Amino acid sequence: MRVFPDDNFLDSACRSISGEAAKALVSLKGGRIAEDAVSVIEDWFEPSLEKARLLADLDERIRIHSSEGDQGLLRPALKARAVIAASPEPAPDDYEPSFKVVPATTLGGDWKSDCETDCVIVDGDLIADGTLILNDLSETLCVIVLGSLRARNLDCGGWVFVRDELECDHLYACSLNDGILSVGGNITVQTFLETGTYTQVAGHLTASYLGSTHNSIDVEGKVNCPGFERRSDSDYLCEWIDPVLLEADDSDGDWRCGRQRYPSADYPERIRAGGSPMKFVL
């Protein structure tokens, strides 16, 4: 799988910029995602000395709100934890964060983002006719698209900001619970599964099938997905996910077929291979 922007034709058009220049560019062109994206850039390199205490406090609040089923308090707490957790431990004095800007582009085949760069900014639309993997599972890497993002399959971790529209066949989001997928426009997909990424959509969300097993999905516009209210139910996930991509939840103790089964590590592998996670064809 090829890497952008390092080992392809974009390399000559790619330029490195400072953190201040990155914030200025995102502030100017970021639209609805600008404020949160700039905040992430700033927080990375201004780590709090009270980080551990703050995370412990938020973890306790999240536990309480989750047990009480209070979504109104749970969602802000999850978002606050994600922001704080994304800021790294104090870096060495000689550490210089890396920011790269690439122009709008269309990529042929399968690609993944450069994980040696702290933040990749696409100044325009990013289109891939194959699978696109952003940030792997890293919680301290960021991709900002100052336009729309389109791909056949999309696997995203860390911090991903898309100013306009996000469209793909199958979307998978996981960043070990501390990342964010933020879209300033609409998300339009066949399937969307999150297993550890806080998702916020300023526009509408349209999906044939959707699953959420760890964090919340906040949509300011309309939700066009028949199973949205059941997105965390094991029974619902079993209705549309290929059985070979499911595994029993050991903590539940219920091994009956079709109950308490959740996506396994094979699910993201299917997405990365360019396949469909569904048990049937739409």
What is the meaning of each model-derived region?
Residues T117, L134-L141:
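Short aromatic-glycine motifs in intrinsically disordered, low-complexity regions
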Residues V101, L107, S113, I121-D123, ...:
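Extracellular beta-strand solenoids
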Residues M1-G109, S232-L282:
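Terminal non-domain segments
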